[in-house]
Amino acid sequence: VIIFSDDNSIFNINIENGIVITKDNHLSSEVLVYENLECIESSHPSPTEKSINAGERLINFIESAKNDDQFLILISGGGSSLVECLSDGVTLDELKQYTEHLLSNGYSISEINNFRKKISKIKGGKLSIFLNKRKTLALYISDVPEDKLSVIASGPLVKDDNIISDDAYDDFIKEKLLKIKTSICPPDDFFKKIENHIVAKIENAKRSCEKESISLGYKTFYHEKFIEGDVKDLSNYFSEFLDSCDK
């Protein structure tokens, strides 16, 4: 998240200050040279105390901005775990417990992120509350099927259009959803000054991997479909798929 003043072009901005939140051991030297950027390492794929701390520092950073400041924000896959601010009545231990349960029981990324939205004060469009209708340009690196903005990092800056019924979950998850008071997505006017653009997709990464693999001399097969599910099932699928490619 970067703050810049109203009198600067977005393509020639004078960065006032910013905050960078990424995975443990993933901060590059190119970022660390900027003294006006606060750099934070957090946890992925399961949230920890670092995720809660990152959420608090992000909110404090946004709320410290002046009313006429503008924001440039990059959101990528992994943000759901890296940054969190929990709804009242939800503890970090519970968040970790339920996240591990969802990850280990074959739930899709959409189903996992839908649950995360329900127990969060910033996911599912709710980070827009803290931006308080300031002008914002949000750029996305997508890691989800169909590149749905409401799914990438659990959609902190877009109105939630990916509502999944509680019936999609097992009793262990549904019991928790019944007990907590879930946060509500803000009204439409909170999103009017937020401009969203996808700048990179899974397809870009796949094509780059394909190109590099071919350049290294490997026999390469490009898989068109997005694959997700239980690793036990998928390992069998890929074994059969690769076997068929050789015939």
Predicted features and spans:
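N-terminal loops that bind phosphate or other acidic moieties
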Residues: 1-247
